[in-house]
Regions:
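A fold-level detector for beta-propeller and closely related beta-sheet-rich head/sensor domains
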Residues: 1-217
Length: 217
């Protein structure tokens, strides 16, 4: 998707003394789109033409994506037969993995249609970080709707001044539900080298749902 020239010299907010508003070309809009995803009001939802302030509602809609909480490992090692997954855990010292991570903080994960996987601290309710999958990043310019520049939800304030709110399209982003599982595998160290031995790791897979065919791990 191409990034549209949303704010330019003929746009709704063209007269604002701001370095990111009223410029022709796409460079300001590329930066504005990134800032919008980070919570700024680049598309002027409150109609005051201040595109550097924080939006009142930052989080995109969580539609089909279910919330998944990851805390201390708690899978069972109680088994009655050797063909059970619990037997495999017990035979490969899952108990040690569980003990070593008993204080792992609880984090809630969910995908939103702002194109991000969100990690939210389960105790404080504050977002710790968000991840934009590369495939979904390529879809983000599709939220820009040039026809909505200054023409969405037009209202008037107490003094009779026109207030226009706009302007993005609703799209599907990270629309699938995260899946979590403890896996016994060889991973990579901080230098990117493959480990020589296997160990237990908690793996989070993020399908995109209606955002597109694919997933991230």
């Amino acid at each position: 998707y191409a990034i549209l020239d949303y704010h330019n010299t003929t746009s709704y907010c063209s007269t604002v003394a701001n370095g990111h508003v009223g410029e022709n070309g796409h460079e300001d809009d590329a930066k504005g789109l990134i800032n919008f995803m980070n919570g700024t009001d680049y598309f002027d939802y409150n109609g005051d033409c201040n595109v550097t302030q924080k939006r009142e509602h930052v989080l995109g809609d969580i539609y089909h994506s279910q919330l998944v909480e990851i805390g201390p490992p708690d899978a069972s090692t109680d088994f009655t037969a050797p063909n059970e997954e619990a037997y495999f855990r017990s035979a490969n010292n899952y108990q040690g993995f569980r003990k070593n991570n008993i204080d792992r903080r609880k984090v809630i994960y969910a995908g939103s249609n702002s194109g991000m996987l969100h990690a939210i601290n389960a105790e404080t309710g504050k977002e710790e970080w968000a991840f934009v999958p590369p495939f979904i990043a390529g879809l983000m310019p599709s939220i820009i709707n040039k026809d909505l520049d200054g023409g969405v939800d037009v209202t008037y304030d107490d003094e009779g001044n026109k207030v226009a709110k706009g302007g993005t399209n609703a799209v599907f982003g990270v629309d699938g539900s995260p899946v979590v599982h403890d896996v016994y595998m060889a991973g990579y160290d901080s230098a990117g080298n493959l480990d020589t031995t296997k160990s237990w790791r908690t793996i989070l897979m993020i399908p995109y749902g209606r955002g597109g065919a694919g997933f991230s791990v």
